């Protein structure tokens, strides 16, 4: 029979009871530095999420392949089949729109996944616990995603633009305004399109459903307009053509699909207004609904 060991003396409790002068109770002082959280912390958290998720790299990789690959392929085919002087009045930047039309689906998908995937996995509860301000969480997601989407799109379209100008030797030289619209303008527009997808993902809370809705919004107006043959539907047909997303994207390359509708920088202001309205609605819903 072994002799029981005497109890070990307890370690002294750290003196965290600093107390304030004149207070009858001691005040607790945390051994860990405590700082007031702000938007920068939420942005840092969302940046860690978006760059550590494997789907981000895959989606952006496919986007680069589509935009650059199709843009260069179209330019090469046009140059190979063009006769002398046939491209004299064409803007060489305009051939980059074909790859961007398909590539925008990747940005839409990534935008939806940035928010909706957290609802699918349940991680949104952890996110909201760490940052109880729901509007701050959505704002941080929007800022990080917009920065990523704009940067990748701008680099892609700039590479395609420079390559197409050198490949299409018979085309005219783009003006400064055309360079701005064909690189900066279209990049902002695609990033805003992805931002609308992000907001829709937070509203729908279902990845497949939100992606389907966004692809429908991109393609359905143009497809529906093609089947409106009657004269009574001519007004609706023209509106669908003029304000469809493919038509608005083509405006940045001065090759609009229609003679009417938005011109110049109008598509960018339209997208900005729709994004602001959608974001305000999403914040309102986020404040009222449980996660």
Q: Which residues does each PLM region occupy?
A:
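Transmembrane helix segments
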Residues: 207-243
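Cytosolic juxtamembrane amphipathic/interface segments immediately preceding
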Residues: 40-52, 257
């Amino acid at each position: 029979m072994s002799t029981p060991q005497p109890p070990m003396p307890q370690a002294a409790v750290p003196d965290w009871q600093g107390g304030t002068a004149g207070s009858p109770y001691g005040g607790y002082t945390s051994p860990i530095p405590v700082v007031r959280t702000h938007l920068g912390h939420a942005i840092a958290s969302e940046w860690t999420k978006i760059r550590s998720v494997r789907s981000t790299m895959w989606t952006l990789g496919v986007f680069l392949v589509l935009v650059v690959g199709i843009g260069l392929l179209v330019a090469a085919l046009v140059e190979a089949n063009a006769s002398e002087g046939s491209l004299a009045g064409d803007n060489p930047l305009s051939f980059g729109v074909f790859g961007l039309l398909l590539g925008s689906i990747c940005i839409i998908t990534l935008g939806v996944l940035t928010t909706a995937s957290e609802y699918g996995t349940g991680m949104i509860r952890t996110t909201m616990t760490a940052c109880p301000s729901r509007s701050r969480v959505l704002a941080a997601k929007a800022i990080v995603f917009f920065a990523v989407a704009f940067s990748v799109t701008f680099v892609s379209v700039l590479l395609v633009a420079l390559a197409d100008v050198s490949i299409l030797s018979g085309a005219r030289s783009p003006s400064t305004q055309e360079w701005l619209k064909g690189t900066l303008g279209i990049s902002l527009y695609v990033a805003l399109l992805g931002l609308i997808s992000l907001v829709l993902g937070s509203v729908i809370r279902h990845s497949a459903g939100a992606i389907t809705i966004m692809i429908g919004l991109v393609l359905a107006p143009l497809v529906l307009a093609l089947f409106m043959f009657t004269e009574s539907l001519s007004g609706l047909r023209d509106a669908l053509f003029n304000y469809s997303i493919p038509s608005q994207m083509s405006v940045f390359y001065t090759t609009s699909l229609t003679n009417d509708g938005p011109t110049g920088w109008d598509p960018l202001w339209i997208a900005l207004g729709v994004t602001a309205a959608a974001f305000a609605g999403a914040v309102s819903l986020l404040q009222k609904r449980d996660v």
